[in-house]
């Protein structure tokens, strides 16, 4: 794509890619980072999200430095953490994990944190952390079992996908919706634009939804 700097998304998440496309930004490459996302003992949710976003950016930068076509690109990484109080919920991959998450979230408030980390062409690191407060309705056991049967929760922070069936569980949300999906668009585009990335470059060719 001529006319703008190269842009790399350090993620394999279809949701983050879709959100970027929604904002008219199309990555030149995806560089998912193989990072251990296990929280450290006693680690707070904010600190965990920030640490993992930076680790993903570091890993992607090392990969990009070895690629002549991408060297000097903007690199964006992100990590989303769902927490009840100080308790970090897992990215559920097992049925028991998902059920435990949903029972914990049922009828309660929780917070979703997404940390974004941008590496500039000069290899400077810029980070932002965005918080959204979410309240779920009280979930019956039938709700939980039916949702688990959908499979929508697999690999999702907190064991749910707000852009899917679980959107019907939300009683109240305070803050960025796209943050809960996995990438806060306002903060992301503001950060990119502030570092000189032409965020409007793709708008003329954007497809209306």
UniProtKB/Swiss-Prot annotation:
Example of a GO MF term: dTTP diphosphatase activity
Entry keyword set: Cytoplasm, Hydrolase, Nucleotide metabolism
InterPro entries per UniProt: ITPase-like_fam (IPR029001), Maf-like (IPR003697)
Residue numbers annotated as active site: 79
Keyword Cytoplasm in annotation: yes
Main localization, broad class: cytoplasm
Subcellular localization: Cytoplasm
Enzyme Commission numbers on file: 3.6.1.9
Catalytic activity: dTTP + H2O = dTMP + diphosphate + H(+); UTP + H2O = UMP + diphosphate + H(+)
Sites marked Important for substrate specificity: 15, 80, 163
Family, per entry: Belongs to the Maf family. YhdE subfamily.
Function according to Swiss-Prot or TrEMBL: Nucleoside triphosphate pyrophosphatase that hydrolyzes dTTP and UTP. May have a dual role in cell division arrest and in preventing the incorporation of modified nucleotides into cellular nucleic acids.
Protein name per Swiss-Prot or TrEMBL: dTTP/UTP pyrophosphatase
